[in-house]
Amino acid sequence: MSDNEHTTVRIVDIARMAGVSVATVDRVIHNRGKVSEENLARINEVLHEVNYRPNLIARSLASGRQYTLAVVMPRFAQGEYWADFDAGIVRAEAEARRYNVTIRKFFFDQYDRSSFEKLLATLRGETFDGAVLATLFAEMVSPFTRELDERGVPYVFVDSNLPGCNQLAYFGTSSFDAGAVAARLLYDRLDPGSDIVVGRIIHRGDAGSNQCRSREEGFRSYLQQQGFRGKLHYAALRLDDEAYNREVLDDLLLKHRAIAGAVTFNSTCYILAGYLAARRRTDVRLVGYDVIRRNGQMLDEGVVTALVAQRPEAQGYRGVMALCEWLVEGRRPDTAENNMPIDILLKENIRYYKNNLI
């Protein structure tokens, strides 16, 4: 029987196929009342044949059971990476209502470790049935998940995966491989002996996110495999201090004349791009991550060589829906590690990119 037939099979159809009454099928499906062993065997055989699954969504609505999901994510402004992720949450929220599921969002400052510590303290006093966790601060997320395990609260990871945890699923790219992709995009455009600038946003209390560290590991690994003979130079930059960033980069590029490439491992490559455009440094190739508005504009203008994208809206949407299906239907995702495609965007194809594809 086809998948479409599976979804439309009715109790009356099962009764007809098993040669029993509708009432008998109802007693078996809902586990109420006695049924002869012969009829039970017939009905179970048909249920297996048609791959029947009871309508647990309708049952949940009828029972009045309410579920709450906690979505833990960085605070954002419109046009930033996490705004796209939030669009996926909003989209899933509309569908989650049919499961009697409501969503509560909890925000932290992704550039401030103490902000996440305070949020975890808040979450310990909250009651929720499942959680979507952005894993930027891996060293704090892992211990917190053990607390969720003890409470019997299922959770999914987004942004980057963490080993040694009991997550229901992960939705995101392979950060290591995404780093290798960026390295290839840059290395193929450089002489093997050229130097590379790595732009890093200054964090308060932490060296950077788990995802950025994994991307850098993949980046370095690829360069090493290719026999890269240049050097990596790190530029500690600030989010909203153009004068400071200009001074840092002027000094770095003046001291290291072999610099011909640049990369950032988060969504802020527009900072480096703005500097290169202002200084007319067309000799420096820049690769970054995420199709946010400012990055896309710099790519379209030819300042950015390439962007690596990871479909944040799909991550948010699928994370919420996986928890809904598990809580209400008892259905796990087909795979625990759900890697998004690693999309490569160039000036020639960015106008056709649909970042919101689920």
Where are the language model's segments positioned?
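N-terminal helix-turn-helix DNA-binding module of bacterial transcription factors
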Residues: 1-64
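Hinge/cleft segment of the Venus flytrap/periplasmic-binding protein
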Residues: 46, 50, 206-207, 223, ...
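Amphipathic helical "hinge" segments at domain boundaries
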Residues: 54-114
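Hinge/beta->alpha junction and helix N-cap segments in small-molecule ligand-binding domains
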Residues: 74-83, 104-115, 172-178, 200-220, ...
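Short helix-capping segments at alpha-helix termini
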Residues: 95-99, 151, 223-230, 277-283
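Hydrophobic alpha-helical
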Residues: 131-149, 233-294
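Flexible loop/hinge segments that line or gate small-molecule binding clefts
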Residues: 140-177, 292-300, 304
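Hydrophobic alpha-helical segments within soluble ligand-binding/sensing domains
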Residues: 170-196, 245-246, 311-328
